[in-house]
Amino acid sequence: MIRSELIQKIADENPHLYQRDVERIVNTIFEEVTGAMARGDRVELRGFGAFSVKKRDARIGRNPRTGETVHVEEKHVPFFKTGKLLRDRLNGKS
């Protein structure tokens, strides 16, 4: 499912809301989650999961094509840990 499909699904299930309002709400949610993660904060959605940022240390890597060793800088990457309710639902335990 892509963002536009999510917006359409929410708008269809809530006919009292205009699609442009739903789009604004969805975009605001994504902006807030992104902003919180950019600040290094954890975003937890109970039952669904938690978004956080993990630090990857600098390391020596290898170019798989040439075999040449390369220095890979330290970086921060997004991380998602599923919540118990989501995990159970995915495994047919709901």
UniProtKB/Swiss-Prot annotation:
Q: Which GO terms describe its biological process?
A: DNA recombination; regulation of DNA-templated transcription; regulation of translation
Kindly state one GO CC term assigned in the UniProt record.
Answer: cytosol
Q: Name one GO molecular function term.
A: structural constituent of chromatin
CDD domains linked to this entry? IHF_B
Q: Which InterPro entries match?
A: Hist_DNA-bd (IPR000119), Histone-like_DNA-bd_CS (IPR020816), IHF-like_DNA-bd_dom_sf (IPR010992), IHF_beta (IPR005685)
Keyword annotations for this protein?
DNA recombination, DNA-binding, Transcription, Transcription regulation, Translation regulation
| One Pfam family linked to the record | Bac_DNA_binding
The subunit field of the Swiss-Prot or TrEMBL record says: Heterodimer of an alpha and a beta chain.
**Function summary:** This protein is one of the two subunits of integration host factor, a specific DNA-binding protein that functions in genetic recombination as well as in transcriptional and translational control.
Q: What family classification does the UniProt entry report for this protein?
A: Belongs to the bacterial histone-like protein family.
Name of the protein in question:
Integration host factor subunit beta
Q: Which organism is it from?
A: Roseobacter denitrificans (strain ATCC 33942 / OCh 114)
The gene designation is ihfB
